[in-house]
């Protein structure tokens, strides 16, 4: 679905990091309480101090999360929550979805999404933008995710931060 969405040539404002998002301001990052490797988070915060890299701007949903996908009989049939559309780096959308997959399931599922997306789209996602989206996870994440899942599946709240941490560590390795 993300590859198709990003192929649409629809008008939208350009995405402005630190302005068009609810992520903490650059100077407001904090290591989540459940982090097992605070140094990983701090390294990612340091990467965010660099200006964002230029990337091809595509149409973005900007809130591409599993909880915003409509399903019927095991297939995605639609997408909700269109109030944040922009044009920008495709890794923003993929990274938001990766963050939820890591928090809810596993960092391996999160990485598999990135790999499949790159394979299908024929592009490499910029790790800076991936980190930007992954770092939307903070201490309020478990509350929001648990509420959005609303009993549809078990939620392992204590393990969320450490699973997202592994996804962040993987993105840092890709960055070099």
Where are these regions (language model features)?
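Active-site-adjacent helix/loop segment of glycosyltransferases
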Residues: 123, 127-131
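Active-site activation/catalytic loop segments of kinase-like enzymes and analogous catalytic loops
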Residues: 92-122, 134-152
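Signature tryptophan residues that serve as conserved aromatic anchors
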Residues: 41, 71, 82, 128-129
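An alpha-helical support segment within catalytic cores of ATP-dependent transferases
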Residues: 7-62, 160-171, 175
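N-proximal accessory regions
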Residues: 59, 132-176
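Protein kinase-like catalytic domain
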Residues: 2, 6-10, 102, 121
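Active-site acidic catalytic loop and adjacent metal/ATP-binding pocket
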Residues: 46-92
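Hydrophobic core positions within the conserved protein kinase catalytic domain
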Residues: 2-5, 48-49, 98
């Amino acid at each position: 679905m993300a590859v198709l969405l990003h192929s649409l040539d629809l008008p939208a404002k350009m995405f402005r990091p630190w302005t068009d998002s609810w992520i903490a301001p650059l100077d407001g990052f904090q290591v989540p309480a459940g982090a097992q490797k605070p140094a990983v988070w701090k390294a990612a915060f340091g990467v965010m101090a660099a200006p964002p890299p230029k990337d091809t701007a595509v149409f973005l949903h900007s809130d591409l999360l599993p909880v915003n996908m409509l399903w019927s009989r095991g297939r995605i049939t639609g997408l909700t929550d269109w109030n944040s559309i922009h044009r920008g780096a495709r890794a923003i959308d993929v990274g938001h979805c990766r963050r939820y997959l890591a928090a809810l399931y596993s960092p391996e599922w999160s990485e598999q999404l990135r790999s499949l997306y790159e394979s299908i789209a024929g592009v490499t996602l910029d790790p800076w933008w991936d980190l930007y989206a992954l770092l939307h996870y903070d201490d309020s994440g478990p509350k929001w995710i648990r509420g959005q899942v609303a009993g549809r599946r078990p939620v392992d709240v204590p393990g969320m931060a450490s699973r997202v941490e592994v996804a962040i560590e993987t993105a840092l390795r890709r960055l070099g």
